[in-house]
Amino acid sequence: MVDAPHSKCGTFGYVGSSPTAPTLMNTYTRFDISFKKGNGCWLWDEKGKKYLDAVAGIATCSLGHSNRILRKKLSAQLKKVQHISNLYKIEEQEELSKYLTKQSCAESVFFCNSGAEANESAIKLIKKYGNTVHKGKESFILAAESSFHGRTLATLSATGQPKYQKGFEPMVKGFKFFKYNDIASVKKLFEELKANNQKASGILVEPIQGEGGVIPGDKKFFKELREICNKYNSLLILDEVQSGVGRTGKMWGYENLEIEPDGFTLAKGLGGGHAIGALLVQKKANIFTPGDHASTFGGNPFACRAAITVLEEIKRRKILKNVLERGNQLNEGFTKISAKFPKIISGIRGLGLIQGLVINDSYTDAKTITLKAFDKGLLLVPAGGNVVRFVPPLIISRNEINILLKKLDLIFEEM
């Protein structure tokens, strides 16, 4: 999962950023700018300055800004019904669930409103599974170091970065952490649990770590994770809040790893800029019964229509092909730029249109580069590990990638 902008750990905590109205709680530090118009991959501020957006609302605006088809479909939906609650059947929700299950390994879907809510749902599901299957034994949820799963107390407890947890202790009990892409670390945890007559009810893990530094999952590691979960009767749930819905060039992040999880979570790009989250599960994990979980707004007709439209447009416009092509173009450009500026760039990571430049911290930092990009009319966002993150709309064109690379080259040239 990828984090929302915050000040405590510095995603947007820039020097010179401006506080907003005193009527807003002080949870963010923001740029002193307000965008008034958007179209495709571009935004315009109140002074008319144009920006190429490689943030996309933090990997959210899949179809770009002010998409014509999305506007048309949502306008029509508002003329029908936008919210009625889950006391009643919702046709749009059923349509979306069929679309999602047809295209994935899942058989059932629970809808909510965000990535944190989707991961909270996954945590509850894993806990119920453990209490059902491993009766009488203390069980734990395993998660990765450097992960990010959300800001609710349970998802924060599942996040393997103590800096986010500081000040909110005690964390929810029942989580243990392993090193990402290190199967020996996972096996050690399972052996320790077995020795203590304890169980792992499930593993919650990202197929590509976003906030942790744009770190792709290793195929061999995930295949062994799948085998271990099968052996110990533990669920394998993937957090695809950031990597799902085409971001990596595959429809789902797990497809890059050549495995099938027992479930996975979605949000961000699913609604194309509109709030929706989802937990998708296979038969083994389809254990919720009425009363186990709920969401007032989850799966409302408006949000579901947005998601249906996003999925339809991805298919109609062959957007996955564009993500792969533009991702390759971006990577090739990064390779040339890193060769030109080896003192600044120490690595390139990512898949499709979630990529990161690892910045040599002895030279500068990701925040500084992001600020300089802002001045050049390019919107970027940092990630952990001194990484500059690139998550543009999935519709970005060849010419727009070239513009991005030229701006980036100029930024490094001036440093």
From Swiss-Prot:
Cellular localization per UniProt: Cytoplasm
CDD domains: OAT_like
Modified residues (N6-(pyridoxal phosphate)lysine): K268
A biological process term (GO) from this entry: L-arginine biosynthetic process
Annotated EC: 2.6.1.11
PROSITE patterns associated with the record: AA_TRANSFER_CLASS_3 (PS00600)
Any GO CC annotation of this UniProt entry: cytoplasm
Cofactor: pyridoxal 5'-phosphate
Cofactor note: Binds 1 pyridoxal phosphate per subunit.
Keyword hit for Cytoplasm: yes
Pathway listed: Amino-acid biosynthesis; L-arginine biosynthesis; N(2)-acetyl-L-ornithine from L-glutamate: step 4/4
Binding-site residues for pyridoxal 5'-phosphate, renumbered to this chain: G115, A116, F148, D239, E240, V241, Q242, T296
Keyword terms of this UniProt record: Amino-acid biosynthesis, Aminotransferase, Arginine biosynthesis, Cytoplasm, Pyridoxal phosphate, Transferase
A molecular-function term among this protein's GO annotations: identical protein binding
Catalyzed reaction equations: N(2)-acetyl-L-ornithine + 2-oxoglutarate = N-acetyl-L-glutamate 5-semialdehyde + L-glutamate
Enzyme class label: transferase
Gene3D superfamilies: Aspartate Aminotransferase, domain 1, Type I PLP-dependent aspartate aminotransferase-like (Major domain)
Residues annotated to bind N(2)-acetyl-L-ornithine: R151, S295
Stretch forming the signal peptide: none
Source domain of life: Bacteria
Further details from the record: May also have succinyldiaminopimelate aminotransferase activity, thus carrying out the corresponding step in lysine biosynthesis.
Family according to the record: Belongs to the class-III pyridoxal-phosphate-dependent aminotransferase family. ArgD subfamily.
Subunit structure: Homodimer.
Protein name: Acetylornithine aminotransferase
